[in-house]
Amino acid sequence: MQLDIRSDRPDVLTKFKALASEPRIKILEYLANHFCNLTEIAEALEMNLATVTMHVNVLEQAGLIVCEHRPGERGTQRVCSCQFDWFNVHMVRMREADIGKLLEFPIRIGSYSDFQ
């Protein structure tokens, strides 16, 4: 199965931010071949459980993995899996007709107070 990431979707930055981390990439690679709980991920990747939990939360919120609660030895455990074999990024291009609709405003340095 593949995941299509479109550059014109509002959630694209969430997905890219989730992918912009070496530990999260390692977790994704591990989950591509395993269906396991957080403790198993932490042990296999030699990471702290709290760190794995934080990274898994980011990946789940971005829709890159799926986690579900299942009965465990003591209470419930969170079991995770990667639902995708491929990630495709579709860059949306502007049509030539739309380029003329862009507005440009000259702003002198220091003429603004908020930026990111």
Model-flagged regions — what are they?
Residues K17-R24:
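Short helix-coil-helix linker/hinge
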Residues L64-G75:
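Beta-hairpin "wing" of winged helix-turn-helix
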Residues L49-A50, N57:
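Key DNA-contact positions within bacterial/archaeal DNA-binding proteins
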Residues V12, E73-S113:
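Conserved segment of winged-helix/HTH DNA-binding domains
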Residues R24, N33-N37:
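Short capping segments at the starts of secondary-structure elements
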Residues M1-K17, A62:
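N-terminal leader segment of winged-helix/HTH proteins
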Residues E43, M54, E60-Q61:
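Alpha-helical residues within the helix-turn-helix
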Residues I27, E40-E46:
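A short acidic, leucine-rich amphipathic alpha-helix
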